[in-house]
Design a protein with these regions (language model features):
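Active-site-adjacent betaalpha module
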Residues: 10-18, 30-141
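Short catalytic helix/loop segments, enriched in acidic residues and glycine
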Residues: 1-13
């Protein structure tokens, strides 16, 4: 997980340098605990949106769609822990409501490495462009 967070941090730093909007989504079911906090290696900076969801995906329990559309955002670059949970749900829902998607494969992780691999290689490419963090950063120019 440390390597995943390090790569995510590189992408976040470049996005900040380029003034690309960053939106964090945290999950809190019931009481807040240290396990529900955003990891200290990728802490949001001042002015970055942090939305709190109570379900697996962000679209059913947050105002994320409204926030994105108000900013004119049409393409989402996704990173997250729980490839088979949060990331999968976000890919499916966001695709259904016409967002263009890029999933950063090495900025996502799952408890089951094989499930992560299958999602990245077989399922996500049907609805998203799957790239590594380095490929994404190179594409930014």
């Amino acid at each position: 997980q440390k390597e995943t967070l390090g790569k995510a941090n590189e992408v976040l730093a470049e996005a900040r340098d380029r003034s690309i909007p960053i939106i964090y989504v945290e999950v809190v079911r019931g009481e807040r605990t240290p396990d529900t906090e955003i990891h200290h290696d990728i802490t949001p900076k001042a002015g970055e949106a942090v939305l709190t969801k109570s379900r697996t995906g962000p679209f059913s329990t947050t105002e994320i769609d409204e926030v994105l559309r108000k900013q004119g955002i049409e393409t989402l670059a996704l990173m997250g822990i729980s490839t088979s949970g949060c990331v999968l749900t976000t890919v499916r829902w966001a695709s259904d409501i016409d967002y263009k998607l890029v999933v950063l494969s090495d900025c996502c992780a799952d408890q089951d490495d094989e499930v992560h691999r299958v999602l990245m290689e077989k399922l996500f490419p049907r609805q998203a462009t799957v790239v590594t963090s380095q490929q994404f950063l190179r594409a930014l120019g």
